[in-house]
Amino acid sequence: MYAIIKTGGKQVKVEVGQAIYVEKLNVEAGEKVVFDEVILVGGESTKVGAPTVAGATVEGTVEKHGKQKKVVTFQYKPKKHSHRKQGHRQPYTKVMIEAINA
């Protein structure tokens, strides 16, 4: 059984026992998290929501928080001795999926 959930402005396909990386959630490591915005539940029979599947939830446990690899942006203006270098590390949350309730 699998499901497609919406979290952090993105859609993610999940299965039980899978670890996913999502945008940072305001939940401590080790706590349970429930995703209510389930767009599709698949398996023997597929349920498609309009826009979400009524009563369907996905449960998981937060394993850790962290930051992704640095993305470097560099801008310059030729012949003007003007340049700017900037780095960014996006925070994420690692979630282990435990149950899909449909």
From Swiss-Prot:
On the tree of life, the source organism's domain of life is: Bacteria
Keyword RNA-binding included in the entry's annotation = yes
Alphabetically ordered keywords of this record? Ribonucleoprotein, Ribosomal protein, RNA-binding, rRNA-binding
- InterPro entries, per the entry: bL21-like, bL21-like_sf, Ribosomal_bL21
Functional description taken from the UniProt entry: This protein binds to 23S rRNA in the presence of protein L20.
How does this protein assemble?
Part of the 50S ribosomal subunit. Contacts protein L20.
Among HAMAP family, the record links this protein to: Ribosomal_bL21
Q: What is this protein called?
A: Large ribosomal subunit protein bL21
Organism this protein belongs to: Enterococcus faecalis (strain ATCC 700802 / V583)
